[in-house]
From Swiss-Prot:
InterPro entries: P22_portal. Homododecamer. Interacts with the terminase large subunit; this interaction allows the packaging of viral DNA. Interacts (via C-terminus) with the head-to-tail adapter protein gp4; this interaction participates in the head completion. Interacts with the scaffolding protein; this interaction initiates procapsid assembly, thereby ensuring incorporation of only one portal ring per capsid. Interacts with the capsid protein. Keywords: Capsid protein, Late protein, Viral capsid assembly, Viral genome ejection through host cell envelope, Viral genome packaging, Viral penetration into host cytoplasm, Viral release from host cell, Viral short tail ejection system, Virion, Virus entry into host cell. One of its GO terms (biological process) is symbiont genome ejection through host cell envelope, short tail mechanism. It holds the Pfam family P22_portal. This is Portal protein. The gene is 1. The keyword Amino-acid biosynthesis does not apply. GO terms for cellular component: viral portal complex. It comes from Salmonella phage P22.
Amino acid sequence: MADNENRLESILSRFDADWTASDEARREAKNDLFFSRVSQWDDWLSQYTTLQYRGQFDVVRPVVRKLVSEMRQNPIDVLYRPKDGARPDAADVLMGMYRTDMRHNTAKIAVNIAVREQIEAGVGAWRLVTDYEDQSPTSNNQVIRREPIHSACSHVIWDSNSKLMDKSDARHCTVIHSMSQNGWEDFAEKYDLDADDIPSFQNPNDWVFPWLTQDTIQIAEFYEVVEKKETAFIYQDPVTGEPVSYFKRDIKDVIDDLADSGFIKIAERQIKRRRVYKSIITCTAVLKDKQLIAGEHIPIVPVFGEWGFVEDKEVYEGVVRLTKDGQRLRNMIMSFNADIVARTPKKKPFFWPEQIAGFEHMYDGNDDYPYYLLNRTDENSGDLPTQPLAYYENPEVPQANAYMLEAATSAVKEVATLGVDTEAVNGGQVAFDTVNQLNMRADLETYVFQDNLATAMRRDGEIYQSIVNDIYDVPRNVTITLEDGSEKDVQLMAEVVDLATGEKQVLNDIRGRYECYTDVGPSFQSMKQQNRAEILELLGKTPQGTPEYQLLLLQYFTLLDGKGVEMMRDYANKQLIQMGVKKPETPEEQQWLVEAQQAKQGQQDPAMVQAQGVLLQGQAELAKAQNQTLSLQIDAAKVEAQNQLNAARIAEIFNNMDLSKQSEFREFLKTVASFQQDRSEDARANAELLLKGDEQTHKQRMDIANILQSQRQNQPSGSVAETPQ
């Protein structure tokens, strides 16, 4: 019991120190929320005005709404980069899981509430919790959910020694729950507490924080970070031979089982480990003490507006604080003018009592008579005036009011420009790029809030990843969301056997260390709208009927949204895949590409048919020329043989002749031989000229065929796709 009291005393002492350190900034933030959401007439302002009518002419709300809309229109994507040996594909799976959980309804509500409070009060927050995936008694699978924290400026109290915006250096944090007695009963049932143990005033205390009021019970969740050294055992895997590490606390019940499985302990180390514990307290008792939760970070994500420190005290503000004075002045001027109009609807005349004696009821202002009566004479028969003596002049609106009203309104609107509407500027005659540049200048006013939200989302990603390491420890199926919004089912911790090495491998093991960072930019839908506008502009500058025009038109079709355009979008997607421009992503799209390639191979183009005809004709003529060459060679061989035969006969005749006639016959043979040689050379020259002519004709036709074939190959592959009209 004494330990419990000491524990409570320690927690409440730290909490009071944190509460006191942030009291001034918290009070200003609460006033900003009240001014923006409830009433713009503060109680102290009543001392300085006697107006009977007090209107609220709000120009702050459009500014807040504009900033909130811009923050929602430009979502922040949380990305992971693997480190310390983590697998890149596991980082992609982790990012897909994060997107899926962020699409949950409670996650959107939590972030939207925090963003609105960031803009109005300068600070907001949400929390990450774990919950069971389903109510099956055989399943212990847990998922991560986000919960909103309303009025975070007064319900989330951080460690006063924390100096970082994301509070990653905070050693403790307190979340306060304000509830009625019925709310206490529900809270006790949720956390398995005794509902009859209601906090009361039976133990007087002098704590700064008002733990109890007449109708409200305050319950606090106290988170604290504990860093301590733990023993880690390093084993050698009997299958892979690689070292694996386990914390002694995690495997204390299965150490013998690991030894029986063949795991060999090779070393042990002392490692510094962060753990987070949660305690539930009231002002009188510690209801639950130091319960270990998943992850190694406090699961509270703060998001600040304009943030800093002044004399070691944390200060923050939103846009409302800068607009309060101008808004108050505007309300007073407008209310003053309205009060004048309401209290003096028309001029009132002055009469002598004798003028309306007996007719006073006609001038009480309650009835509207068609005519009014006056006395002509008094009681002494003296004539009386027949008209009012004078009129009560209505108070006029001071000219300074118009100037002050304009100045007050401008002061409020200067805090945040509402931007430029394309249709409202010169009837839509201003260029689209010019309007975008003007809006980009207006967006610079929200950049501080957007950048601080990116810091908060980065912190959310770090907390999410640390919780994932603890709760996703068994094989299970999860749904991941890709960057374009499509979904895919994957299995975590899937074990497969590498057929090449025979070793087991674990796929999609997301347990590891990752570097978290954010990407601030337009949403996927906004990028599609911008791409459509740019493609439309290019279509107007590209000649119709060209392959480039067809490609741009098909790309534009793929970016269409809404009902009734599914057929056009699918048609364009199929055409782009068949053209080879877009890579197939699904088995169906791969089948489209295969069919297009087969159709392309089987289709006979007229130009190609003509080229093939020229090629075959050239080949036939070449064969004909070769046959002619062979024929000439055969004829030459026959002539040579005949010449040899004739030479033999001549030699025989020459040997049988007389010596006196041999000299004459020899001269005759020389003359005949010279004549035959000249004829042979002429025939050979004619044959060579014939072959050269055939070869030149064949070469020209082959060149024509090659040119046609190269033109066919260089023609864009889009020619097989239909041209959309």
